[in-house]
Amino acid sequence: MKTNRILIIVAAAVLLLTSCNNGHERMLTIINEDGTCSREMSFHPYPNSVMASSDEPIENDGLHFGADWQRSWSVVGDSVCHPIPLTQEQWDSLQRVFPKQTVRDKILMHTKRNFQNVSEMSDSLTSVVRHLFKATASLDKHFKWFYTDYVYQETLAITDIEQIFSVPLDRFVSADTASYWFTGQPNLADGLTGAEQKELLDEIEANISHWFNACTMAFVYTYASLRYDEVKNPPVSKEQYLALKDSIVMSPAVRNMDLFSDISQVSKIIKDFYHSDAYTPLFSDSKEWERVLDKKYKSYEYLMMMAPQLDYVMPGKVIDAGNGVVEGNVVRYRFSGERLIPHPYDVAITSRVTNVWAFIVTFLVIILAVGSFFYYRK
């Protein structure tokens, strides 16, 4: 069987081998004092996306945009945005300018939309991503006379994660270890030497790899049961076969698999477990299994490809950026899809707007009070 494209992508994402932000793709969120907001997403587009008319729905790496999103494009590093659609002539011209690179890597598509409130905005993001994903957001205003605090919170999460990973992650690593591997927090390597850090990471990587193998094996094993009536002289009944799934999934043989680069590995494990080759024909069509696995992991592939920098602009001055970093008037959050695996991803930002009018009113009240005091003393 040829190495499955989706499995390579998924494996790389899970093992954090390719989970770096290219620095160009981002999601800019602007919160206004009146509660209205806007969101702009910038990403490298495929030709059919950037060449589509503004009233035509588009899909780009699993992101879905309708006609209610304003669209434009720009060359990477250039602040000038151009209207869509980009023409074939423009695409060819850009290819001549960048002969050794793909045009897609040298341009960005920008999609922007305004919202009445942050709830509407988060619902829209859920619709854009769609695949096993949900966003929720809230904005609270706290009036304190001389100033008003704005507290913005947003949570990004994977929904129904068991659709992809049916075997619980906590059977392989602790909650803190999983969080450290996928998000970097808590820092379990704090105080360790370089050699000790490598030993720790090697152990975690082996356990995460085992978990992924187990989840994939569980899916393949269960999916094969749908064709159980094709098995000639099975060593056990279908009910017994399914009941023994956990024993297969958690076996040492699964731990050492090469992430299903060859479906015959699955067949061999099952054959060795049951001491029978009755199930071997179920795995004879490698191309069919490639299609099955491709479909299984497509939604997850899209999630793992998400790695935009999250930028937030709040009203007034930011006084608490949470886990973000303040750069000028922008709060930046580092984000990538695999960070959603152990737990939801939280954004929490508090900003403060000075109420100038409150100072003026207070000053006038003081002046009136002092004036009244001296007036009545006369």
Regions found by a protein language model. Give the residues of each.
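Bacterial N-terminal signal peptides that target proteins for export
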Residues: 1-7
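Generic signature of intrinsically disordered, low-complexity, basic-rich segments
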Residues: 7-9, 174
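C-terminal motif of bacterial Sec signal peptides marking the signal peptidase cleavage site
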Residues: 16-19
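Start-of-domain marker
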Residues: 21-93
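Glycine-rich loops and low-complexity Gly/Arg-rich segments
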Residues: 52-55, 64-66, 336, 357-360, ...
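Mature, soluble, non-transmembrane domains
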Residues: 70-366
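Juxtamembrane interface at the cytosolic side of transmembrane helices
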Residues: 367-378
